[in-house]
């Protein structure tokens, strides 16, 4: 039987004949420890409350499946989406130039050992980033009231 990587590569060929369907991300080894991800989100430890590089207070209870942003009037980074430039400060990514070779070597070895393709991972898209900066309800309201 082929590896998930081999099945995926067969699947994307124009006339490919994969031996079976793959489950969602089965063919991918997700690299979660790249320098940018570690820099932006690396301080999220189970059982703690911390601030990320965006200034969002993050709670990660022991019994929770993942970290969640904490929003109170004094902790919300972006209380008014129409004035986001005044309160949201993008982290300086130029400081993330170290550690790429080690990350690449370690991640590639893990992917090869599992017979998978190596993939980067970024779990925070535009909606999720807004949710972290201004809260879930305020994000939904802002998207409705200010679609541009």
Give short role names for the model-derived ranges.
Residues 1-148:
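Catalytic cores of TIM-barrel enzymes
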């Amino acid at each position: 039987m082929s590896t998930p990587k081999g099945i995926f590569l067969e699947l994307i060929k124009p006339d490919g004949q994969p031996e079976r369907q793959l489950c969602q991300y089965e063919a991918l080894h997700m690299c979660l420890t790249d320098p940018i991800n570690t820099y932006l989100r690396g301080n999220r430890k189970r059982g703690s409350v911390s601030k990320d590089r965006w200034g969002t207070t993050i709670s990660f209870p022991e019994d929770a499946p993942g970290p969640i942003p904490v929003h109170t009037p004094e902790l919300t980074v972006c209380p008014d989406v129409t004035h986001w430039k005044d309160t949201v400060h993008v982290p300086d990514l130029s400081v993330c130039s170290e550690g790429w070779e080690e990350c690449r070597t370690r991640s590639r070895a893990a992917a090869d050992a599992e017979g998978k393709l190596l993939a980067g991972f970024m779990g925070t898209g535009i909606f999720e980033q807004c949710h972290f900066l201004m809260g879930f309800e305020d994000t939904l309201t802002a998207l409705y009231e200010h679609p541009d």
